[in-house]
C-alpha cells in the first residue's frame, strides 16, 4: 500500500512539473500593460479632452495586491491586478491626468498616461498587471488624478485581484479612496 501511494505521489509530481514547464512560456513575458496602450485599447471609451478650463479635480488612492504573504511570510501568493476607472457621469466627460503605479516602498513602478485623456460618459478604462509581474509587491498602489470642466459624479475607481493558491482560486476587490478634491 505504501509503495502504491509513493508511486502515485511521484506520478502527480511529474505531471505537475510537466504542466509547469508547458505553462511557463505563456506567462514569462507577461508584464504590466505598457504605457500608452490605454489610448489604443480603449479608443471607443475616449473622447476629445475638453478645451474649457478644468474647474473640478481630484485624486484616488487604490491599494492593490500583486503579491500576498502567507504562512508567517514563508509563502507568497501572486495575483493579477485589473485597475478599472469608471466615468460615473451620464453627461460629462471625465479627464484622467495621471494613472501611476507604485510599489510597496512608494517608488514609482510605471506611469500609464503620456498625456491626459477624456472618458466618454459612463465609459471605463483599465490597466492590467499580469500575475507574473510582482514589481509592486505586497503593498502596491495606484494613484489616479482626474478632472472635469464642472460638477460631475465622482468616478468609481477599483482594482480586481485574481489568483490561484494551491488548487483554489481567489478574487477580491479593493476600492479606491478619494485623497483630494478641488472645486465642486
Residue spans for each PLM region:
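Intrinsically disordered, low-complexity Pro/Gly/Ser/Thr-rich segments with frequent PxxP/GP/PP motifs
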Residues: 103-141
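Short, solvent-exposed loop/turn segments enriched in Ser/Thr/Gly
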Residues: 75-82, 140
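Short, hydrophobic/aromatic beta-strand segments
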Residues: 92-99, 110-112, 154-156
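Short, solvent-exposed beta-strand/turn "edge" segments of beta-rich domains on protein surfaces
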Residues: 68-76, 89
Amino acid at each position: 500500500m505504501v509503495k502504491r501511494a509513493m508511486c502515485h505521489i511521484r506520478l502527480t509530481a511529474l505531471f505537475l512539473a510537466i504542466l509547469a514547464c508547458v505553462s511557463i512560456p505563456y506567462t514569462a513575458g507577461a508584464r504590466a500593460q505598457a504605457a500608452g496602450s490605454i489610448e489604443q485599447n480603449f479608443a471607443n471609451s475616449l473622447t476629445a479632452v475638453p478645451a474649457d478650463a478644468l474647474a473640478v479635480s481630484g485624486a484616488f488612492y487604490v491599494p492593490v495586491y500583486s503579491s500576498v504573504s502567507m504562512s508567517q511570510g514563508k509563502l507568497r501568493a501572486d495575483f493579477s491586478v485589473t485597475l478599472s476607472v469608471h466615468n460615473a457621469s451620464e453627461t460629462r466627460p471625465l479627464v484622467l491626468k495621471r494613472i501611476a503605479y507604485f510599489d510597496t516602498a512608494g517608488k514609482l513602478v510605471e506611469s500609464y498616461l503620456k498625456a491626459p485623456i477624456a472618458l466618454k460618459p459612463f465609459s471605463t478604462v483599465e490597466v492590467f498587471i499580469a500575475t507574473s509581474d510582482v514589481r509592486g509587491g505586497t503593498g502596491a498602489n495606484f494613484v489616479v488624478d482626474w478632472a472635469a470642466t464642472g460638477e460631475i459624479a465622482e468616478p468609481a475607481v477599483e482594482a480586481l485581484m485574481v489568483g490561484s493558491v494551491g488548487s483554489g482560486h481567489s478574487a477580491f476587490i479593493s476600492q479606491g479612496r478619494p485623497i483630494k478634491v478641488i472645486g465642486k
